[in-house]
Amino acid sequence: MIILIDSGNSRLKVGWFDPDAPQAAREPAPVAFDNLDLDALGRWLATLPRRPQRALGVNVAGLARGQAIAATLRAGGCDIRWLRAQPLAMGLRNGYRNPDQLGADRWACMVGVLARQPSVHPPLLVASFGTATTLDTIGPDNVFPGGLILPGPAMMRGALAHGTAHLPLADGLVADYPIDTHQAIASGIAAAQAGAIVRQWLAGRQRYGQAPEIYVAGGGWPEVRQEAERLLAVTGAAFGATPRPTYLDSPVLDGLAALAAHGAPTA
């Protein structure tokens, strides 16, 4: 059994992959903890049906957090290997000028999405809504040409509340023409997030001559889903397309499992 670790800025998401089980079994459902609650990680390890042999993970929460997670795993008899983005792995070719500068979580997420695809597939747009929102494209040739990073919905809301004198930590409904401050902030955040998806969908369509399939993930997606789907529908209609995002619960863990299963480069 191999433990899979996605250490994000806010949450620690964990699962497992068992290459020795029939059909290379996965966890029934991934589990998420606050990234500061390593006691919860230790308790989860104690519930596993088999003692893990090792762990594979990606960590964007800093060196100290990675060391603390590694210590918790070691206490359970399991060493972890933290992965970094590679120039080429599982067919995904990394187009970053410096390939290892690409966030390991973004890379593993794209690997996970690509692992779901047949050999011939359309362009793919992978949007993850966490502390930061990232939007990454994979071409039909399996090349990642680049992507966007912007503040996630919660960070946008917090920045307005803490960086200004009078704006609240907003909790309002999204509207075309907001009529109070809470609505105005909520609508602005949803518009920014949805607009980024539409921008990259249009860019992919122009670059590849066909509409990208959209995959979404992350805890911030429910907040922006309605506005994103509305703008995508309006935009797609102009091209005779109906873009419908597919939600994935744990594409980073899926990518780690694929890398573990196929022995792909992970140094």
Swiss-Prot record:
This is Type III pantothenate kinase. It comes from Bordetella bronchiseptica (strain ATCC BAA-588 / NCTC 13252 / RB50) (Alcaligenes bronchisepticus). Belongs to the type III pantothenate kinase family. Pathway: Cofactor biosynthesis; coenzyme A biosynthesis; CoA from (R)-pantothenate: step 1/5. GO terms for cellular component: cytoplasm. Catalyzes the phosphorylation of pantothenate (Pan), the first step in CoA biosynthesis. It catalyses: (R)-pantothenate + ATP = (R)-4'-phosphopantothenate + ADP + H(+). InterPro entries: ATPase_NBD, Type_III_PanK. The gene is coaX. GO terms for biological process: coenzyme A biosynthetic process. The active site is at residue 105. Pfam families: Pan_kinase. Substrate binds at residues 96, 103-106, 181.
